[in-house]
């Protein structure tokens, strides 16, 4: 089942370069936070698909019941454990086929023009994806959301560092280091972004 999400905010996207931390072939991925009031229609379709997929897997495995694997969507909570009011969806795409052919998601701007800008967390995006059912004996029956493409409505460019300005600091009279870095490095406090983590019809 192929769908396009409503607009939401990208969370820890790996859309320009594949993440190879846990897979040498790499994966493209993003989480998408969608306000609950806008996610209802999508959730309904996915829940219905998941139930039909589960029944199919039970039939194929000749079982009345199978263990169910967690869905790749859930309520989002902040660092204090409070509900944000968003539903968090998880999308993934392998960077290579089993035959070694390179894959990557389609990236387009709001006008559907191809783009290469680095998409960072907080960008407002829509995701084109394919929902697929699967079964693995050790895990059970589940559903995956296979990333196909992303439309960027509002870009927040990825940055590997955090600037002094973005942290809210202002220039003050007082101590000044004798070992002044270049303007570029002065403005950037290195902090790597947390890595926890076919055409699209937009």
Regions found by a protein language model. Give the residues of each.
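Short, basic/aromatic beta-hairpin or loop at an interaction surface
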Residues: 91-107
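OB-fold/S1-family single-stranded nucleic acid-binding modules
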Residues: 137-157
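Acidic, gly/ser/pro-rich intrinsically disordered tails
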Residues: 157-202
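Exposed beta-sheet edge/beta-hairpin loop segments within beta-rich domains
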Residues: 106-125, 134-143
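Eukaryotic short linear interaction motifs
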Residues: 98, 134-136, 159
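OB-fold ssDNA-binding interfaces and closely related basic DNA-contact patches used
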Residues: 1-96
């Amino acid at each position: 089942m192929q769908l396009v999400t409503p607009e939401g905010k990208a969370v820890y996207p790996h859309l320009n370069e594949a993440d190879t931390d846990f897979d040498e072939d790499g994966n493209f991925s993003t989480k998408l936070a969608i306000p609950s009031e806008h996610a209802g229609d999508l959730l309904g379709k996915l829940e219905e698909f998941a139930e039909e997929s589960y029944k199919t897997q039970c039939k194929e495995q000749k079982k009345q019941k199978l263990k169910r694997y967690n869905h790749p969507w859930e309520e989002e909570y902040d660092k204090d454990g409070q509900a944000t009011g968003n539903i968090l969806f998880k999308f993934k795409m392998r960077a290579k086929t089993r035959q070694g052919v390179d894959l990557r998601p389609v990236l387009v701007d709001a006008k559907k023009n191809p783009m290469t800008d680095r998409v960072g967390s907080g960008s407002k995006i829509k995701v084109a994806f394919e929902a697929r059912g699967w079964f693995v004996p050790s895990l059970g029956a589940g559903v995956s959301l296979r990333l196909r493409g992303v439309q960027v409505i509002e870009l927040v460019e990825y940055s590997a560092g955090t600037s002094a300005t973005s942290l809210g600091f202002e220039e003050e009279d007082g101590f000044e280091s004798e070992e002044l870095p270049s303007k570029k490095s002065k403005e950037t406090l290195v902090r790597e972004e947390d890595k926890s983590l076919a055409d699209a019809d937009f």
